[in-house]
Swiss-Prot record:
Pyruvate dehydrogenase (E1) is a tetramer of 2 alpha and 2 beta subunits. Eukaryotic pyruvate dehydrogenase (PDH) complexes are organized as a core consisting of the oligomeric dihydrolipoamide acetyl-transferase (E2), around which are arranged multiple copies of pyruvate dehydrogenase (E1), dihydrolipoamide dehydrogenase (E3) and protein X (E3BP) bound by non-covalent bonds. The keyword Metal-binding applies. GO terms for biological process: pyruvate decarboxylation to acetyl-CoA. K(+) binds at A196, I197, D199, N201. It is an enzyme of class 1 (oxidoreductase). It holds the Pfam family Transketolase_C. Residues 1-33 form a transit peptide. It comes from the Eukaryota. This is Pyruvate dehydrogenase E1 component subunit beta, mitochondrial. GO terms for molecular function: metal ion binding; pyruvate dehydrogenase (acetyl-transferring) activity. Its main location: mitochondrion. Its EC number is 1.2.4.1. It comes from Saccharomyces cerevisiae (strain ATCC 204508 / S288c) (Baker's yeast).
Length: 366
């Protein structure tokens, strides 16, 4: 298992440049007539929420600075002006309070979108998320649903230290009653968020701060107000020699690694973007392993009890085990609280060279 290369290497860090915004009510329409057909993840999330707020009067957004400040990361820009303070609600700095309020609203039939400024702060509201929201439908014998979304930035950023860099995908992925989504591209963000808002179950929607300003090509289909995505994995790059299964920002590093492996070593790597942690698309994972006979998983979480560990267990317990020609490798974050110093922070998370090195070891390439 790899957590990093033995030498410190520069990481391709997504820039957090300011983004210009189209008014949410016209964002998707403007793109339909644009020759570029690109959208940032931030714009995708913004347009998804705008369309769902417009579609259903029971949907509302609540959280710290989501209204007058347009969101800490400007994801909710323009929503207050369009929908008013009854639908876009600023709160005090009290995650336990506003999350409990939102869960109560969901139990009464409304459809809240709860924004955490960071999912690290969701720990202040963990009882409401994993007990009240996740378990009520089951404990009521299916008579009481709790339709809501918990969303916000999750995982590592740049220079924010140990208490603001954790990836909570394994935490929430272990809870029955929750669905956990992990978008990578603008199309992922738009389609999955719209699906999550319409889902009758509570959904944890884990975004990545460093992807907010990244632009992606987006299809005509994805610009439709009715566009949603299923909670299924996506093959981002076809390959025949090894499968790289990953999610959110590590998809970017995995695609870069696949390009290097092809050009430098003639290795054809298949890159699988999970898009959903719970439900986990085990069928897609088994299928790619049976195709390539080799597997590595890539995540920025701590090594122990992570998403990669669950994937390894699922593969070992399935028919895919008989197709493996080498042990599975996990590429993870380091087993330490995230350092603040840049040199140490760079060393704490996977990047493109780390993935290349792991693939070479699995395939016994010198």
């Amino acid at each position: 298992m790899f957590s990093r290369l033995p030498t410190s290497l520069a990481r391709n860090v997504a820039r957090r440049a300011p983004t210009s915004f189209v008014r949410p009510s016209a964002a998707a329409a403007a793109l339909r007539f644009s020759s570029t057909k690109t959208m940032t993840v931030r714009e995708a999330l913004n347009s998804a929420m705008a369309e769902e707020l417009d579609r259903d009067d029971d949907v509302f957004l609540i959280g710290e600075e989501v209204a007058q400040y347009n969101g800490a990361y400007k994801v909710s820009k323009g929503l207050l002006d369009r929908f008013g303070e009854r639908r876009v609600v600023d709160t005090p700095i009290t995650e336990y309070g506003f999350t409990g309020l939102a869960v109560g609203a969901a139990l009464k039939g409304l459809k809240p979108i709860v924004e955490f400024m960071s999912f690290n702060f969701s720990m202040q509201a963990i009882d409401h998320v994993v007990n009240s929201a996740a378990k009520t439908h089951y404990m009521s014998g299916g008579t009481q649903k709790c339709q809501m979304v918990f969303r916000g930035p999750n995982g590592a950023a740049v220079g924010v230290g140990a208490q603001h860099s954790q990836d909570f995908s394994p935490w929430y992925g272990s809870i029955p009653g929750l669905k956990v989504l992990v978008p990578y591209s603008a199309e992922d963000a738009r389609g999955l968020l719209k699906a999550a808002i319409r889902d009758p179950n509570p959904v944890v929607f884990l975004e990545n701060e460093l992807l907010y300003g990244e632009s992606f090509e987006i299809s005509e289909e994805a610009l439709s107000p009715e566009f949603t995505l299923p909670y299924k994995a996506k093959i981002e790059r076809e390959g025949t020699d090894i499968s790289i299964v990953t999610y959110t920002r590590n998809v970017q590093f995995s695609l870069e690694a696949a390009e290097i492996l092809q050009k430098k070593y003639g290795v054809s790597a298949e890159v699988i973007n999970l898009r959903s942690i719970r439900p986990l698309d085990t069928e897609a994972i088994i299928k790619t392993v049976k195709k390539t006979n080799h597997l590595i998983t890539v995540e920025s979480t701590f090594p122990s009890f992570g998403v990669g560990a669950e994937i390894v267990a699922q593969v070992m317990e399935s028919e895919a085990f008989d197709y493996l020609d080498a042990p599975i490798q996990r590429v993870t974050g380091a087993d330490v609280p995230t350092p603040y110093a840049k040199e140490l922070e760079d060393f704490a998370f996977p990047d493109t060279p780390t993935i290349v090195k792991a693939v070479k070891e699995v395939l016994s390439i010198e």
